[in-house]
Amino acid sequence: MNKEEILKYVGFDLDKAKQIYAWLHADCEQAPTPSLPNEVVSIVEQDGKKLVRVDVGNKYHFGIDLHDAPNEMNWDDAKKYAEDKGMRLFTLEEGLLMFCFKDEINAKLKEAGGDELREDDYYWSSTEYSRTNARLVHFINGTATINLKSYGYVVRPVAAFTCVS
């Protein structure tokens, strides 16, 4: 999938997003003031933690941890690792958006003192496929695949954002 196909897959309407973007962030002090589509990624602090924030349209707002987990882990351990940090695994759609904006995300991760997303590994998503399988995202080409939850893969937690006026 290319960037446009992924944005369409996750239901992102660029024209509509441009129209509602100002409204979306009107009451959110932390929100960046980008002009879509090029500046949807920013560095923010939430709960004393520096994150790379991604804002796409009116549906996807999340912060990416600056670092991967120290080791690859199975899906259950990956979920627990993220939860112990007060975060979660990204959804499949969020992972695909991370692929779409990986250059911008990696630049901000580096600027914030974090580690770039690896292109040579698969990352766990929170999206389950079955009782024994979950979805993964590969950041070199945006591949979304399925594998056993018992296998070890890379983990990059994310946090949800809410605007408080």
Q: What residue ranges belong to the model's regions?
A:
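The identity of the second residue at the extreme N-terminus of proteins
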Residues: 1-2, 165
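Extracellular adhesion/carbohydrate-recognition regions
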Residues: 3-87, 121, 133, 154-158
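An exposed tryptophan-centered "aromatic clamp" motif
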Residues: 75-88, 92-151, 158-161, 165
